[in-house]
UniProtKB/Swiss-Prot annotation:
Record's protein name: Multidrug resistance protein MdtB
SUPFAM superfamilies: Multidrug efflux transporter AcrB pore domain, PN1, PN2, PC1 and PC2 subdomains, Multidrug efflux transporter AcrB TolC docking domain, DN and DC subdomains, Multidrug efflux transporter AcrB transmembrane domain
Family, per entry: Belongs to the resistance-nodulation-cell division (RND) (TC 2.A.6) family. MdtB subfamily.
Membrane topology field: Multi-pass membrane protein
Main location, first listed in the record: membrane
MF-aspect GO terms: xenobiotic transmembrane transporter activity
Amino acid sequence: MQVLPPSSTGGPSRLFIMRPVATTLLMVAILLAGIIGYRALPVSALPEVDYPTIQVVTLYPGASPDVMTSAVTAPLERQFGQMSGLKQMSSQSSGGASVITLQFQLTLPLDVAEQEVQAAINAATNLLPSDLPNPPVYSKVNPADPPIMTLAVTSTAMPMTQVEDMVETRVAQKISQISGVGLVTLSGGQRPAVRVKLNAQAIAALGLTSETVRTAITGANVNSAKGSLDGPSRAVTLSANDQMQSAEEYRQLIIAYQNGAPIRLGDVATVEQGAENSWLGAWANKEQAIVMNVQRQPGANIISTADSIRQMLPQLTESLPKSVEVTVLSDRTTNIRASVDDTQCELMMAIALVVMIIYLFLRNIPATIIPGVAVPLSLIGTFAVMVFLDFSINNLTLMALTIATGFVVDDAIVVIENISRYIEKGEKPLAAALKGAGEIGFTIISLTFSLIAVLIPLLFMGDIVGRLFREFAITLAVAILISAVVSLTLTPMMCARMLSQESLRKQNRFSRASEKMFDRIIAAYGRGLAKVLNHPWLTLSVALSTLLLSVLLWVFIPKGFFPVQDNGIIQGTLQAPQSSSFANMAQRQRQVADVILQDPAVQSLTSFVGVDGTNPSLNSARLQINLKPLDERDDRVQKVIARLQTAVDKVPGVDLFLQPTQDLTIDTQVSRTQYQFTLQATSLDALSTWVPQLMEKLQQLPQLSDVSSDWQDKGLVAYVNVDRDSASRLGISMADVDNALYNAFGQRLISTIYTQANQYRVVLEHNTENTPGLAALGTIRLTSSDGGVVPLSSIAKIEQRFAPLSINHLDQFPVTTISFNVPDNYSLGDAVQAIMDTEKTLNLPVDITTQFQGCTLAFQSALGSTVWLIVAAVVAMYIVLGILYESFIHPITILSTLPTAGVGALLALMIAGSELDVIAIIGIILLIGIVKKNAIMMIDFALAAEREQGMSPRDAIYQACLLRFRPILMTTLAALLGALPLMLSTGVGAELRRPLGIGMVGGLVVSQVLTLFTTPVIYLLFDRLALWTKSRFACHEEEA
């Protein structure tokens, strides 16, 4: 029977050691809570970091970019500019479309922003054109955020107009109702309509004008209230045949009488069922299709939203005819799931490697089982807390848990090693557990809180990066806290019940061989340490040189923002000459599609031509290239992009810009490339002067590639210069001229056909098949005040001019965006510096301001705060350690280990060819928390030896280094192996995880080698400094 130690031993662990059943059940409760939490947690690619973003779209068919800017965009912008919480407002006014994107502060709820936007639209309504076909429509979606799912709807038996009608009424509306869906857009522009194509010669011969026809149609098709009759006994509702709903009915419409004979619409026009906008088209691979893009609301869970869509699709497709086929072309969640699965596999691999290293050191199965239980328990228990904090299972939280594997095992190792040491000395297991746990308790607390102190600055990081790493930091901190609890409760209890002198002494051939190897290593370390202690100044110079080297490496290492991920989807923009027509652009798009689909890595392609609010002009096309799964293709996305661009370069007259889609989207506009730089001025003239000059210089920089600008000011314009005096003499107003032109060439929506399920438009235009180009203007006729018909050419001259194809604003001022990529042999930091240097050489006028946008702006912000972030982490750790040790000196000794970690991490990143990006910086901050553990374990035991055994500082630190060498080596290798799977990851999302692993492995290797020697020397140096300081104070007191 064991004699129980005094109740004073064991510290906080005593209660749990003495009550094994209660401790076991408590741990089971943590385990069950974690399992339940894991099942309840949503899955996503990254933590929720979206800015509240709302897009406002206004369509005004036929309006020029200048008219859209002045008549639609500007009135709306003035109202939006008064909203509180607005961070940035950008707009794009192109032919027939105005798109305004409103980005709000992160702290503003999206519902509040929505209310403000609706109020602003209402306030601007009276200032908008009276003939606007539809009011502005807003959606809670970021236009730069790629769709979560893309579907193609095709049919071999039905026209596309019928297909779109069915998709819009039966499919799109239902998907829009799913929680998390922000916007469902149909690309292809085949909305059904009745198209009236006037024969200009026929109406001229009859003395009619297009305005006569328009008035007749609008008056003949109405759908308004007619009232009801209320008699003594019956009530009767009034109805009439006031609506015409088919092309045949419109053909029979009488528009005028001449000589008593009716003139019907079919006599002067071709009336047919067609598409509302004939200048829109979409293709799935090579087949014309209706392409449905589903975008999520900011803040919505992408996985659950996509799952809901897939669950509904079978039901929706059953409601369509069998000749209509619905195909899922892309689903972003496929790669997100694969990335999360790969990270989970790496987490399990890290746990296995850590357990293996424990067995290698302890060489005892019972002693290995204890941390083998503590590690997964600490990690699983973290899931329960994540649920309460509304976190998700994503790449960053799983990376935090993977890294935590090496952290949480440290506590268990330290406890087991200390208890085992007393058992090997002959103590009973229970007494050894109480004594060892009590002795090591303060060390565990020091390790835990000093490590959490490193994470505190991450929680105070501002803007998007702070939001991004909030879940990472808190998840890691929670895992570390749970680990500390488990190490002070379950671990000593299990040691007391599972360890014994017999089990620890039981050895096999492997145990004996490894024991001899460790003894030789420790002996060699002891001899080396003795020599180092005899030459302290040489060692100190090595420590100082690592500090200098870390600063130099920090300055010269290439810097980036966020790793470019391979998500299997490429966004593309196809650019043709500015005067390209829709037909010409559609032909070029088909040529490019043929080339792209021949690439072995491409699975499918969707493409779109036309102006719809997202695509700004007819001379550009949007592409989405869906690649095969990563395990089915030989190359990653960047190589595929380079290969596709080389192939498309052979197609004449087009430029192709490609970029891989990313899980982290900071931009608010669809861009041609990954990075953006803007020039903002007070006038378009200033931009037209300086944009070409800057573009010329930027295109010569080797640090940039794919440099392009959205400044397109060579769009052809037929300027109708009206002789106002002549027009006035004939009684013709400018409104009459505009109406005539709009009727002829604007695809004017002149009337609405109402049905039980939907509403369709009547479109008026001239039939220009026989009079293409500018010749069509010669067919325009106007009505004079005396009823005569006047040719437009008699009162106006037609001049050809150039004008912008689109007008862009940023915070209500004209802006041009320059897009660029960064070549493989340069970093984003190099590109940013090169652009800034080039800008200085131009001496831009004061009325032109420049700014980086999107992730480039976030990179500048993150780079500026990085140094302060690291300083804050060091200061936070110093404060915590100073409080724990009640000393100003010992924390400095502990923190002296940090430069070695920085040198190792930066060297490893440079050797691996990785940039110092946000992920790598987080790894360096974590290293600050890891490497100081070595110093803490040494200093704790040295101080105890000085205090309890009366040893000299040199003997105490020497003994502490030898006693703690094995747990120091064990914990460092455990942390290293925990990060190793991240460094070696090759699956989906590996680009995101690898920099963290590389930095941590490199930092741990270098710091492990150096701190074992530098820490004791610095400890003794500061001890002498403390003695000298005390003696100086004592002398001053005696003199006083």
